[in-house]
Amino acid sequence: MKYLPLIAILRGITTNKVLDIADILIDNGFNIIEVPLNSPNPLKSIQLLVNKYTDKALIGAGTVLNVKEVKDVFDTGAKLIVSPNTNEDVIKETKKFKMVSIPGCFTASEALLALNSGADALKFFPASSIGPKTFNAISQILPKNTKCFAVGGINSSNMKEWIDFNISGCLLYTSPSPRDKHR
């Protein structure tokens, strides 16, 4: 399966809307979907997505902070763990379950620690604070073909600048609209 270099983050989406939103995303080429664990009923949402889209998308959790959460996500059948930080224990537990590990990093030291711990790709977070030029400098010391994603402050107006500096992809938030919060 070839993946679009965009990862949809379904932050704050309720279980009764998660499949409808995923339908739209998948119909438009998204094939990596993350549900942050600080969303409402995240494991139930992940389970619904896994049940419907296992053959069409890589489904998993974000904001994974500890090994217990890795196991909880693994139990849903998901295959992706995204973390906001570089936690060696989380990375190693993720790889123990043969899942894809994308930990967050901010510095060259964190990036190399994540890769040495077994990470499959890196999430540069928050990207708006790092900036594409700093990312480019850090990427020069990473092993060739390291997949790097930018998250936090990435949008249609600045995505091209990141692409020009060879970012592998971006993570984009899908959040409920202000109207949805009142329903």
Model-based region annotation:
Residues M1-T76:
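Conserved N-terminal beta1-alpha1 strand-loop-helix module at the mouth
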Residues L37-N51, K68, S83-K96, L112, ...:
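Active-site-adjacent beta->alpha loops and helix N-cap segments on the catalytic face
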Residues P5, Y53-G60, K96-I102, L142-F149:
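Short beta-strand/loop segments at the ligand-binding rim of alpha/beta enzyme cores
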Residues Y173-R183:
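Single conserved hydrophobic/aromatic residue that forms the stacking wall/gate
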Residues I33-S39, L58-L65, A78-N85, S101-F106, ...:
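Catalytic beta/alpha-barrel core
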Residues A61-G62, F149-I154, C170-Y173:
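Glycine-rich beta-strand-to-loop/alpha-helix junction loops that act as flexible
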Residues V67-D75, E110-N116, N155-N166:
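Catalytic cores of alpha/beta
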